[in-house]
Amino acid sequence: MKSRLRFVAIGLLSTALLSVGSAPAWADDGSIVLDFVRHGQSVDNAAGIIDTTPPGTELTATGETEASTVAQAIQSEYGNGIAGLFDSEELRTQETAAPLAAELAASGHSASLETLSGLNEIPAGAFEGHATNSLEGILYLLAPLSWAFGDVLVPDVGDPSVNGVTFDDSFGGAVQTIYEGTASATGTPTDVAFSSEGAIAVWTLMNVDNPDFSVLLQEVEETEGFLPNTGQVVIEGSPGDWTLVSYDGTAVPQDPGLGTELFVDFRNLIEAPQFAGYDIYEALLSGSSTTLDTAIQGAVSQVDTALAQFPVAVFDDIIGVFGGTI
């Protein structure tokens, strides 16, 4: 990401920060720990070229060094406590994951490396191969940033068949697969998933209960991107109830403050009819009246639930500021 991309991202993130805040404290209350790791430097990455179509380009010599370094750091932190290793269909994530898989295998760890297509980068479509520091690079970012703020029906400018709903279904499906494979393990199992910058950052902000836009804004200012090569984003919890633990090494408070809590309440409220509407749209395309009826019933239930939960969530958040009493 270069200067123009940074300008756009900072503008949008700063707008979000007008209504959110953070407070210290973190508590362990999750079902699994999921450590997302961005790939090391790839050939197109180093050249500043948008590269989202698998398999993409391989790692550079620098990227290979980064992969070895992050493998040692992850093994040092989790040891043989890693329940599962995952990567995307992109060559750069597979080559980044390989050193960790090799080190774990050498130490007698039985976890195998599994490839999940849902961990692929957000498709750039018509902008594939363009410079990241270009108008096309800026347009590529607009829809994903909108999804992070709750406007999930905004289509990917480069590929209108992709929107926040389809992206969340795809990446979230991969996360669901990871969760189902390890949630029954003893204690709080840890999984490591190698993916790409945009996919990790956007899906995390869309799904955690404590999205910290200030951390992301700081990242953009310092690195001109959402996450540096081999940067890590750690979340904890279960599908539908994820908490952001740390972002590129910066601890994130579990209690994000009233502003962020109200933002999440509103995000959940406005997303429900969008997801429901897209389900109905897909059902219409199927041509099946049974599928359509099921989609409509599910949509009504989803929207009713969101409408009922919104005032309760807002009330709980507000009284929480006063220690649970008014």
Predicted regions and their residues:
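Solvent-exposed loop/turn segments at secondary-structure junctions
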Residues: G40-D44, E90-T93, L119-P123, E197-A201, ...
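Sec-exported extracytoplasmic/periplasmic mature domains
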Residues: Q72-N80, A98-A106, Q176-S184, L205-D209, ...
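Beta-strand elements within well-structured catalytic alpha/beta cores of enzymes
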Residues: V33-Q41, F86, A185-A199
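Phosphate-handling substructures
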Residues: E58, E103-G173
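Acidic, low-complexity terminal tails and accessory targeting/binding regions
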Residues: D28-G30, P123-T132, L205-I326
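Active-site-proximal alpha-helix that buttresses catalytic centers in soluble enzyme cores
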Residues: D29-T115, N229
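Extracytoplasmic/secreted envelope proteins and their assembly/folding machinery
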Residues: A67-A71, Q94-A97, D168, G172-Q176, ...
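C-terminal segment of classical bacterial N-terminal signal peptides
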Residues: K2-I10, T15-A25
